[in-house]
């Protein structure tokens, strides 16, 4: 099995919102803001093939579904569907994808499911041959969002996914589509039912898989958020998220599971370590994956 990091459309969002209650004097060491206080963000997907005999895409980024006014409001930098172009550059088309795994349905993670915006055209799903995996608890949230996060969802998307006949809701550690090859866990600090997907590693120690890769989604958007106290203003429950992040990182450190970041503009994957003060940190950083073996 090989892994690719697949670039999607990029964003610029307010740095204060991305770093919660961390002061600018701290976070600007990690991300340089522009004149409008916005920082650069990637919307990176992970491609794995063959995984359980399938070609699997973990998330789709923000895509190009926004009309021009909303694209500007949310800082989307390109009007074309960059993820589809990046798939092509890696030797794949969106029709080749067998499974799309979605950590959650916020637009910056699921917008790439849709064709680019065009005047007068209704939203249209891409990936016509793929099974779409969504966490069952988060599916309920997407259908009945809270006023605080309603704007983060694409109103038409749940109905389109359901009408496709290829939606699988996941409510445990494994899915029908991917079997034992991918292990799922769930988090509620960012959004209810956030689904974290771990590609199971090649080694087993004391009955536990070692050496895989986990898609961190918005539990840990990039390297700065590996630090336990750092959360986003977008998180619904920062204290819960910190507790979930601690347990998550302790587990991944113990089992040698690498972290894959979706929003870090410079780093696709890293190893979690403890620094000389015992704090979690990212090390052995990898900027891009190009047909990289899982065990490499």
Where are these regions (language model features)?
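Conserved beta-strand hairpin/beta-sheet module of binuclear metal-dependent hydrolase folds
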Residues: 2, 9-90, 196-218
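Active-site metal-binding loops of divalent metal-dependent hydrolases
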Residues: 8-9, 60-63, 105, 137-138, ...
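Short, P/G- and charge-enriched loop/turn segments at secondary-structure junctions
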Residues: 30-36, 120-121, 184-185
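Cap/insert and terminal regions of metallo-dependent hydrolase folds
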Residues: 74-85, 202-296
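Metallo-beta-lactamase
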Residues: 78-92, 96-108, 124-186, 240-256
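Metal-dependent catalytic neighborhoods of phosphoester/phosphodiester hydrolases
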Residues: 110-122, 271-275
């Amino acid at each position: 099995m090989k892994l690719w990091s697949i670039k999607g459309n990029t964003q610029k969002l307010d740095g204060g919102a991305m770093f919660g209650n961390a002061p600018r004097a701290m976070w600007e060491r990690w991300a340089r803001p522009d004149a409008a206080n916005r920082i650069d963000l990637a919307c990176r997907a992970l491609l794995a093939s063959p995984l359980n005999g399938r070609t699997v895409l973990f998330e789709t980024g923000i895509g190009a579904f926004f009309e021009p006014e909303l694209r500007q409001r949310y800082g989307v930098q390109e009007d074309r569907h960059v993820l589809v172009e990046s798939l092509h550059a890696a030797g794949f088309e969106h029709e080749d994808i067998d499974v799309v795994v979605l950590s959650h349905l916020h637009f910056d993670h699921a917008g790439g499911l849709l064709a680019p915006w065009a005047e007068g055209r209704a939203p249209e799903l891409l990936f016509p041959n793929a099974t779409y995996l969504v966490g069952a608890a988060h599916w309920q949230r997407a259908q009945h969002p809270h006023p605080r996060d309603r704007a983060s969802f694409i109103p038409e998307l749940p109905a389109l996914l359901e009408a496709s006949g290829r939606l699988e809701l996941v409510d445990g550690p494994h899915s029908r589509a991917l079997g034992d090859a991918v292990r799922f866990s769930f988090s509620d600090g960012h959004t209810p039912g956030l689904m974290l997907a771990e590609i199971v590693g090649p080694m087993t120690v004391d009955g536990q898989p070692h050496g895989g890769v986990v898609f961190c989604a918005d539990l840990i958007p990039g390297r700065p958020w590996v630090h336990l106290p750092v959360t986003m203003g977008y998180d619904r429950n920062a204290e819960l998220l910190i507790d979930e992040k601690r347990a998550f990182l302790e587990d991944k450190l113990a089992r040698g599971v690498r972290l894959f970041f979706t929003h870090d503009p410079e780093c696709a994957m890293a190893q979690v370590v403890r620094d000389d003060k015992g704090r979690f940190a990212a090390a052995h950083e990898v900027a891009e994956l190009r047909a990289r073996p899982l065990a490499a």
